[in-house]
Amino acid sequence: MRVVVVGGGIGGLALGSGLRRAGVEVSVFERDTDVRATGGYHITLDGPAQEALSGLVAPEIVERMLASGSALRLRDPDAFWDRRGRVLGYGPELRDDPSLDIDRITLRALLAEAVGDDLHLGKVATGVGYAGDGAPVVWFDDGTSVTGDLVVGADGAHSLVARFLAGGPTNAPAGIVGFSGRTSVNDLSAGERARLGTRSGLVVGPHGAALYLGFLDPVGNAVLDRPELRSPVTTGPTFIWGAMFPDSAVTGALRKLRGSALRAALVARFRELGWRPEVLEVIEAADAESVAAFRFNAASSRAGELAPWPAGRITALGDAVHATPPTAGMGAGAAIRDAADLVERLGSVPLPPAVEGFEAAMRERGAAVLTAAMGPVRWILFTDTVAGAALTVAAAPVLAAAARWRGRR
Ligand SMILES: Cc1cc2nc3c(=O)[nH]c(=O)nc-3n(C[C@H](O)[C@H](O)[C@H](O)COP(=O)(O)OP(=O)(O)OC[C@H]3O[C@@H](n4cnc5c(N)ncnc54)[C@H](O)[C@@H]3O)c2cc1C
């Protein structure tokens, strides 16, 4: 059997590696010319995603991932703050949480290594369909084409392959625009370092303004303490933050800015919405080059609406099918689990039923991940309603007082 994979992001590379290990002939075609010259911050891999990965890549690659990953169990519980910097509550203890955060570039580079010379870079797919003999075929912008027994679209949220199968887009804008950046903890004032601690957190204010802070330290909090195996992009305690606003003319104007101009405009926008300066220091201290905008796209959270096509010899996985906003940190993990499931089925079930079973399981998995990710999105959008804004403002002092009282006990 020969499998053609379109897209060498996280899901496509995980699939390529798994098929190669299983002895299946596979070729992964990716439009980027360098897997490291790509955007992205950190990816969270929970226990099931790590378990899936350990079946897809060789043990030495798993070890290098663990040596480059930041362990959640070494972090303090997540915090919820208000826009004045008051603590409203804490999340659960993380000491038994097996999840890790890893730089997207590091994860992608390690997966690319696992795929080896079955990865073909600089190949832009421009069309997909069936040849006269019924074999699936992919066409590229350089005039070449390739056929296989199975074509898998792992080409992300704007997937060409899934659009061919579904007859249209498989997701839509979720109503929120995100702006991310990277801030070294060493660039924060002593006061702010003490206030934030070694924890991730979320601030949600009225009018749909929210700020996520993700703490990672792949060196100090390494999952596996093997410095000789380490290859993270992040080399010290760092906050990867995501500012979120409802999609509007204001965010449209922000999206046109870059670097320090965007960073300053984000701070100004939060200040207009009543946020205290100390809460915004993490944005002000960010590496200007790291600040970038991205739009949240989401597929349906109803399983029956995902992969709305009959099973055949062309399929898709990951964001191509269940594009997931980053609010639950589960999109990449779901793509990896899709890949592991497809590899397993292709090894034990003949082709048409293998794809049918794979797509049925992926619908359930995708819907579960989307349900988790859309909770925070809906909450943030609710604060942009008159009732939601009033409730957010009224609840903050009550929750802050309750948190102080619990702290005193
Ligand atoms: C640049 C980038 C940065 C990201 N940063 C983060 C992040 O910081 N945190 C986070 O949680 N998630 C991030 N994500 C999303 C996360 O990586 C995905 O949600 C998740 O990995 C799902 O994996 P996937 O393989 O389905 O899609 P992706 O990882 O998006 O991979 C899709 C791949 O297909 C390729 N492709 C698309 N169209 C074609 C074509 N026509 N021909 C050939 N190749 C094509 C793309 O170049 C891409 O490499 C990012 C995604 C991208 C593309």
Model-derived features: positions:
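Conserved N-terminal glycine-rich FAD pyrophosphate-binding loop of Rossmann-like flavoproteins
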Residues: 33-52
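FAD-binding beta-loop-beta segment adjacent to the flavin cofactor pocket
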Residues: 294-317, 322
